[in-house]
Curated annotation (Swiss-Prot):
One of its GO terms (molecular function) is serine-type endopeptidase inhibitor activity. Belongs to the protease inhibitor I13 (potato type I serine protease inhibitor) family. Residues 1-12 have a biased composition (Polar residues). Inhibitor of subtilisin. The record marks A68, D69 as: Reactive bond. One of its GO terms (biological process) is response to wounding. Keywords: Protease inhibitor, Serine protease inhibitor. This is Subtilisin inhibitor 1.
């Protein structure tokens, strides 16, 4: 080791200060998109993928039945006959 270097200073990554911060570092910052109600499915998908890159978008008719399983990488878009989002898209 060279004189004057300190290996502990090579990685200056701040640690979480509390339990809540530790949990938040692994979860998306946004879990729903109420501002997308009324836009087309394509516009909503584009906006969501800008904020959550590895998301799977599932488009369904607003009156359809879907499985009740929770998927943290999925956002469902419920659309009407004109392909406009009718419910707030959210993770699940």
């Amino acid at each position: 080791q060279e004189q004057g270097t300190n290996p502990s200073q090579e990685q200056n990554v701040p640690l979480p200060r509390n339990y809540k911060q530790a949990l938040e570092t692994n979860t998306p910052t946004k879990t729903s998109w109420p501002e997308l109600v009324g836009v087309t499915a394509e516009q909503a998908e584009t906006k969501i993928k800008e904020e959550m890159v590895d998301v799977q978008i599932q488009v369904s008719p607003h009156d359809s039945f879907v499985t009740a399983d929770y998927n943290p990488k999925r956002v469902r878009l419920y659309v009407d006959e004109s392909n406009k989002v009718t419910r707030t898209p959210s993770i699940g």
